[in-house]
Amino acid sequence: MRTEKEIYDLVLNFAFQDERIRIVTLEGSRTNVNIPKDNLQDYDITFFVIDMGEFLKSDDWLSVFGNIIMMQKPEDMELFPPEEKGFSYIMLFDDGVKIDLTLLPVSMLEEYLTRDKLVKIMLDKDNMIKTEIVPTDEDYYIKCPTERKFDDCCNEFWNVATYVSKGLLRGEILFAID
């Protein structure tokens, strides 16, 4: 399995050489200082690009990251229609490394930076990001619900609890466990 440094060097060298890629970010568990690192953590990478079209014409360019043994392109699936303007590649390589690579247009940068605070800027070719970004997992802390949220949760539980008995009485096990 390649090391973290090898993966970062590979990603950053590729991005640095490609003029369409303006910003590279790392998200997720690898940015979280509050959890122990391990070799099984994915590399959640985002490329902010000025032209997504060229990337989407062919997947051949992805081979620079290694020998892909399995890939999923969620935005290209009928099962999960796209929710945003980006495109992602979930890639598993023959050495066990997993890279979740997302392409986003540069125009989405501001919105992106407000969505999740577990972000590290790896490359900013144009100095578009003016403030220091410090990854934090504070959005994931468990917070006490308001009285209203607690009441709503209890109401939902009791409302759908009847589905279990209905499903079991009808012999519809999947309905009962959903």
Task: List each model region and its residues.
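Short aromatic-enriched loop/helix-cap "lid" or pocket-rim segments at secondary-structure transitions
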Residues: 36-39, 113-115
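Metal-dependent nucleotidyltransferase catalytic core
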Residues: 1-19, 27-38, 46-102
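Conserved NTP/Mg2+-binding pocket subregion across the NTase superfamily
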Residues: 65-178
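Extreme N-terminal "head/tail" segments of very large remodeling/mechanoenzyme assemblies
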Residues: 24
